[in-house]
Design a protein with these regions (language model features):
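Short, basic alpha-helical/linker "hinge" immediately adjacent to a nucleic-acid-recognition surface
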Residues: 1-77
Length: 77
C-alpha cells in the first residue's frame, strides 16, 4: 500500500478550535463530520477506521485530507 499523500498535522490552535467547535454543537452536520475527520486523521487513525467510525466514504476522507493540506483549516471545513 502506498504511503499517504495527504498527511493531516493540526497545530495546537487548530486542534483547540476544532474541539471547541465540535463540543459546542454549533456546526452544520457537514462541517461537524469534516471536523471529526480532521481530528481523527491528526490522531493517525487509518482511513478505514475513520470511515467506519463516522459512517462516511473513502472519497470524503481523502477529499478532506487533501483540502486541509492544500488550503488549510478554513478550506477543509
Amino acid at each position: 500500500m502506498p504511503a499517504k499523500k495527504y498527511i493531516v498535522t493540526l497545530t495546537n490552535e487548530e486542534r483547540q478550535e476544532l474541539l471547541a467547535l465540535t463540543g459546542a454543537g454549533k456546526l452544520s452536520a457537514r462541517k461537524m463530520k469534516r471536523a471529526q475527520i480532521l481530528l481523527k486523521a491528526d490522531e493517525n487513525w487509518k482511513d478505514k477506521d475513520i470511515i467506519a467510525a463516522l459512517n462516511t466514504s473513502r472519497s470524503t476522507v481523502e477529499r478532506i485530507r487533501k483540502r486541509y493540506v492544500e488550503g488549510g483549516l478554513d478550506k477543509a471545513l
